[in-house]
């Protein structure tokens, strides 16, 4: 199974980018993992927040395939423990999911079109974090899930 983290905008923080890259490097031992960046549409434009969400939404939908198993990372989504998330990924792997896409929207969230197209949502926390931090947290959780599934001593209960 290939896991894609589809994100809007690049990471400005070198520290966050380096930490995320470290987990991506570690993940290569377990699963194909890729971060796909949609260019930030607000640069050089004067769009309203709704127009920006719509523009980002069109870009997100254009990158999704009909066969993808897609999940929005959204504060209103279902919360999982690390053990539950690892079981969720394992189920996807065992049911033959070829490409699993997790999407982090832009600063104003997801457009109505994206929300209608993608039913599954996961929340990493009820708290609000920067999108750059969510990239790191999510990548670490995927790595943690892989170590749980492989019975490796990274996660402690």
UniProtKB/Swiss-Prot annotation:
It catalyses: pseudouridine(1915) in 23S rRNA + S-adenosyl-L-methionine = N(3)-methylpseudouridine(1915) in 23S rRNA + S-adenosyl-L-homocysteine + H(+). It comes from the Bacteria. Transmembrane segments: none annotated. Keywords: Cytoplasm, Methyltransferase, rRNA processing, S-adenosyl-L-methionine, Transferase. Gene3D superfamilies: 3.40.1280.10. Homodimer. Specifically methylates the pseudouridine at position 1915 (m3Psi1915) in 23S rRNA. This is Ribosomal RNA large subunit methyltransferase H.
